[in-house]
């Protein structure tokens, strides 16, 4: 299996579960609550790494900022209903030593993942440097997950973005978004669309994949779903080293499983994802250079 090297913004995800007691006598709208429990896990690129390790083992290596204070997202729940999110320390100090160490350790055959939450760990020049180093080596595959597409992403092997980012990059709203961004960026492109599936363009095959699926009646929330999609995709390629379409479908399965549980508290296991993949039901239709894939979901 390929080594997986990840660099990105390590965040902290905290979840506070509150029990309502009564209304505040000074303001009937406000609740008086008591804390029932709290969960804290690695978020951002840390969530990606946790799921990668769960899906494909321990040969996953992570570089992140070195500051004591990490950006923290605190989500508050009352009777399991998500009420609000509080963000703290939203910036990570850039450390050139982290970039130096990461670049120096990349080897032939590695999978290199750039998970950029735009908090400060990675700067544009770092992305160029990482991609350039990988181009000098043999069979290194580079994946970039970003909320903004910049010129520095030019030539990355796989660019994964969401639909909002794609529309920001190209002012269009149709299935050809992935193709246009691919031609502009010289990359394979994946555009995730949440519960509506994804669009992907495989540049060497010149093939557009439009993936749709049934509604997930067990949907809880989409927190961290982008990370789990990428974890599923990278882990499948690392384990099987072939098959972009199966890897994309597997990625959607992993994201689907993550949206059926609350937040980023629990990872998706290889056992659960492999079982779901084994029982997969899809239909395909090909029209010119576009492959339409629909997944049927058993919502029991």
Question: What do these predicted ranges mean?
Answer:
Residues 60-62, 158-163, 208-212:
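Short hydrophobic/aromatic-enriched beta-strand-loop microsegments
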Residues 5-6, 62, 144, 191:
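Structural beta-sheet core signal
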Residues 2-4, 11-114, 125-128, 272-300:
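Conserved N-terminal subdomain of the carbohydrate kinase-like
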Residues 9-10, 163, 193:
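Residues immediately flanking
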Residues 2, 108-109, 155-157, 185-187:
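Short, well-ordered alpha-helix to beta-strand connector turns
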Residues 9-10, 117, 228:
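Active-site metal-binding loops of divalent metal-dependent hydrolases
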Residues 125-155, 168-300:
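Conserved phosphate-binding/catalytic region of the ribokinase-like
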Residues 18-27, 72, 76, 80-92, ...:
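Conserved beta-alpha-beta core of the PfkB/ribokinase-like small-molecule kinase fold
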